[in-house]
Swiss-Prot record:
NCBIfam families: PRK00558.1-5, uvrC. The keyword Transferase does not apply. Keywords: Cytoplasm, DNA damage, DNA excision, DNA repair, Excision nuclease, SOS response. Coiled coil: none annotated. This is UvrABC system protein C. It comes from Pseudomonas protegens (strain DSM 19095 / LMG 27888 / CFBP 6595 / CHA0). Residues 16-94 form the GIY-YIG domain.
Amino acid sequence: MTDPFDPSAFLSTCSGRPGVYRMFDSDTRLLYVGKAKNLKSRLASYFRKTGLAPKTAALVGRIAQIETTITANETEALLLEQTLIKEWRPPYNILLRDDKSYPYVFLSDGEFPRFSIHRGAKKQKGKYFGPYPSAGAIRESLSLLQKTFMVRQCEDSYYKNRTRPCLQYQIKRCKAPCVGLVEAEVYAEDVRHSVMFLEGRSNALTDELSAGMEQAASTLDFEKAAELRDQISLLRRVQDQQSMEGGSGDVDVVAAFVNPGGACVHLISVRGGRVLGSKNFFPQVGIEEEVAEVMSAFLGQYFLSSPERDLPSELIVNVVHEDFPALIAAIQELRGRELSISHRVRGTRARWQQLAVTNAEQALSARLANRQHVAARFEALAEVLNLDEPPQRLECYDISHSSGEATVASCVVFGPEGPLKSDYRRYNIEGVTAGDDYAAMHQALTRRFSKLKDGEGKLPDILLVDGGKGQLSMARDVLNELAVPDLILLGVAKGATRKTGFETLYLNDAAHEFTLKGDSPALHLIQQIRDEAHRFAITGHRARRGKTRRTSTLEDVAGVGPKRRRDLLKHFGGLQELSRASIEEIAKAPGISKKLAELIYANLHSE
């Protein structure tokens, strides 16, 4: 048996220098990561007899081991702390759930470059603008660029194989550089103006366009003057919508709000006085978490764990924390740029601050209301199934295909707080008879629950299968084959009328059949999860089917293997454009002889 943790013995050998500490339980699971200016003093504070917060007391009660790492200074300790939190995600740390890469606007190289949304590593040659707080904010900007400057946004493979202008030209969203309807110099000017807008230099851009309009009018080029007038009008309209009153420079306004049910951090991004967008974050927090702790943890994880994120020149926050000086120093050292942080602000900045606080409060209230709604449905389901307590994890499976083609199985997961989308899975089904839903479900469940033997994944409390007695029986067989610990099986079959609200339910085996009233919260939960599984399955199936059909018509052509199929489709920009091409045009594609072009053409046009 492991000896109990002795705080006095540990503290007697603990250093008083800056560093990072890691707390483990008796199973050597990492519970918490922290940093300190003085390790000995900070760790001693955990073991005082009174005054500990409930969360801290619960943490201390589980400590079996503490490890420390001494660092050169507090800044280095903070950077190491954020690295460890991101890697291990300890349960007692405040965790920022949203860690996806943020989107950028990407401007490609070339004579007629395109604007597009980009996520991930910046490997392509070109220019990047952002990051933006959401993809929606980027789509707004790209839409404006199309309307105002008519710059292209189509894929290069599509652009290179156009023989006539597309619909975007007809509706005045593109100048059709693909077919030479705009000179390179004119297009380059449109791109330069677009870049000025994305860089937040809207006022300078408007002044430049106004001067150009006056110049065009003075030379009686009224068509050009009218075009510039329309561009100025659009830009001013957007400036009115997106500008922060009295705003200039690059500012992030961050407000944290906490109540007993959770926490929300609302961030408003202002660049060049223009609002790029805003976003809500819902960190994973413990009971009775202080709002200042939430703010400090958020800023550290947001700016230190993801160095690619854009750094403003100023942060406006609604609370202060004693760690802010060290935090700002660490951010500046990591980024090599100056950053100021403000709390007591007046005038316009105070209104920005209050706006962020209001948004955080409202977002958390809406989230908690929805959580309570879902939690109430889970409680109702527990009552219907005679469970001692509500289930914590419910998985639902569904199958989608088109007459056996491109079969996909889906797995969606719900908890009392709603859908757990990071746990969703899709399974491409292979090697079963086309249209055999039982075999497809058998394969999906086998693949899912086989991983439990390897210690991967969590066991659900309830397994929901979209289907009747047959699917339920098959699911039970899979669980028995894999010796999966007993769990509740629930089958959902459409009733005699096949209308929503008249479903027949099967519990654990086909003999236990029952129905619920149409207004039952438990039935509503079952319907919600089943419909989500169906949606997730059918979107996966459609994507797989589309990918298959793009290549299937070429698969029977001798001499056209997978690589050549990909190259052909990339060269022509898709199967539709390839189908329109003549034999001579196909023969011009790299690696395609005249004879092979004839075979491809014949295959594409055979009845």
